[in-house]
Every structure is written in structure tokens, then in C-alpha cells.
Amino acid sequence: MLGIWTLLPLVLTYVVRLLSKCVNAQVTDISSKGFELRKIVTTIETQNLEGLHHEGQFCRNPCPPGERKARDCTVNEDEPDCVPCQEGKEYTDKGHFSSKCRRCRLCDEGHGLEVEINCTRTQNTKCRCKPNFFCNSAVCEHCDPCTKCKHGIIEECTLTSNTKCKEEDSRSDLPWLCLLLLLIPPIVYVVIKKACRKHRKENQGPHESTTLNPETAINLSDVDLSKYITTIAGAMTLSQVKDFVRKNGVSEAKIDEIKNDNVQDTAEQKVQLLRNWYQLHGKKDACDTLIKGLKTADLCTLAEKIHAVILKDITSDTENSNFGNEVQNLV
């Protein structure tokens, strides 16, 4: 009895090992069958393009190019019922089992494309670049505009390559550059000559630039400016008057004094400043000093204006004097 109880664990261990081997064998067999099933399905999927397609039932052959399947096969290895694709809008270019045709490609003009070959039931639309556009990629989804050359063309633009342009050649500008260098010296000479002539004309004395009789020319340098001070002051700005008198002997202290005495009246400041200068300078050559001083300060227009006023007045006085003398001679 004791021996039986001793052998029982050994028997149970053997049974467990035997059952384990059986289970492993079954699992291995199931895995092997699963692999074989996947292999069969893969083979069937591959054969879809070769003549068999499983969709409900197996169809023996695909629909030819330009057609699509109208309905599923009802019997294994039956012939499919195929109908044509819509001409000009759809196509299929190889045998297939699909119930749909492919949509024809559109050639987008906005991307530089145009139709080369129209779409048929068995062939998709073929696009190409429009004139003056190119595409250098294998599949053209868009075309780029050809480059426009400024300095000449090496190679014209084609459907597959851009224009090759000549680079700007500095030597082409050489003749123009030489011509410009030849023209510069005479142009500079003419400009300088005119500037010198203008400068000489501006620096001429009042009696040199205007044709006067000898008597008027002599008296112009000694003309009494006191009666013209107000007119001259009215033609000048305060800063111009200050600048002139400062350069011609009037001290800063005197300028400040006149300013403080006439703080609210700039017109009176100008008159008093010019009177003070005239008193310091004296009558002799005062007119010439005033005219030349204004021209030196680049106030030629103002100098000519003042000179014209004085000259007109002197000429009028001279004519009146001559008229009086003629009357006396007649008497």
C-alpha cells in the first residue's frame, strides 16, 4: 500500500508532461495553419491584379482598360459585368476589378500648364507647359515662367529648361565711358568760365555795371545815404543789418544798446543800426561800402535793388538839375 502512494506522484508528473506536449503541439499546429491562411490571403490579394478578386464571389477576369465593374460576381470564377468609363472625364489604363473609374487630370493654366493630349477612356490627360513656361522635374505639377534676359540670350527657354542669359559685360559700356571722359573737361571748362564771368560781374562797382554819364559816376561814391537809410532798412532783415554793421565797425556793445532801446520795434532797430554805421563810416564811399558788403554776404539781389533805388534817385535829381540850368540859359 505504501508503494502505491510512493508511485502516484511520479505517475501524475508524467501525465502533466504528456498533456503539456500535446497542448504545445496543438498551438504550433494552429500557428502554422494561421501562417498558411495569411499566405493564402496575401496570394489572393496579389492575384487581384492578375485576374482573381474576392468581393462577394471570385471573378475570373478583371474589367479591361477603359471600363469598370458594374456589379459583383454572383458565382465563383464568373465573368465580371463591365461598363465603359465616361469619355473625356474618366479613364482606366489597365485591367482592374474596381467599380469606379479614375477622374481625368486637369491642366491648370494658373500653374502654367496646358493640354497636350486630351483624356480618353483608356488614357489620362497629358499636360505640358504653356509657351514661355518650363518644367525641369520628372512629374510636372506646375511650370515656372521663363527668365527674361536683359543682356542677351545664350540658350532659348524650352519646355524642360529655363533661358540661359548672358551676364552683364562691363566692356560693352567702355565706349560710352570713354566718350563721357572726353566730354567732362570741356563741360567743366564752360561751367567754370560762366561762374568766373558771373563773379566778375557781381564784383563790379555800381558805376562800372551801369552806364552813367561821368558826372553821375563821380557823385555816386559820395552820395548822401542819410535819406535812404529808412528805405535800405526796409529792404533788409534784422539779422542782415546786424551782420553788415558788425563787419563794418559797429561794436557789439552798441548793437546791444540799440536793441535794448527798441526791444519791441525791430524796424527801428534796423534804422538805428544803419544810422550808427553811417555816422562811423562817413559819407565818402559809404554807398560803395554798403553795396560791396552786401555782395560779399551773398546778398547780390538785395545789393542790386538798393543800388537801383539810389541810382534812380540820383539820375532824377541830375535830370532836374540839367533842366533847371537849361531854363536859366534860356532866360
Swiss-Prot record:
Name the source's superkingdom.
Eukaryota
Sites where Phosphoserine occurs are at 221
The residues that carry sugar chains are 118
Q: Which InterPro entries match?
A: DEATH-like_dom_sf, Death_dom, Fas_rcpt, TNFR/NGFR_Cys_rich_reg, TNFRSF6_death, TNFRSF6_N
Which CDD domains does this entry report, sorted A to Z? Death_FAS_TNFRSF6, TNFRSF6
Cellular localisation: Cell membrane; Membrane raft
What GO molecular functions are on record for this protein?
calmodulin binding; tumor necrosis factor receptor activity
Asked if the record carries the keyword Protein biosynthesis, the reply is no
Q: Locate the Phosphothreonine modifications and list their residues.
A: 211, 318
What UniProt keywords apply to this chain's record, in alphabetical order? Apoptosis, Calmodulin-binding, Cell membrane, Disulfide bond, Glycoprotein, Lipoprotein, Membrane, Palmitate, Phosphoprotein, Receptor, Repeat, Signal, Transmembrane, Transmembrane helix
Which residue intervals correspond to the TNFR-Cys repeats? 47-83, 84-127, 128-166
Give the protein name, as stated in the record.
Tumor necrosis factor receptor superfamily member 6
Organism from which the protein derives: Macaca nemestrina (Pig-tailed macaque)
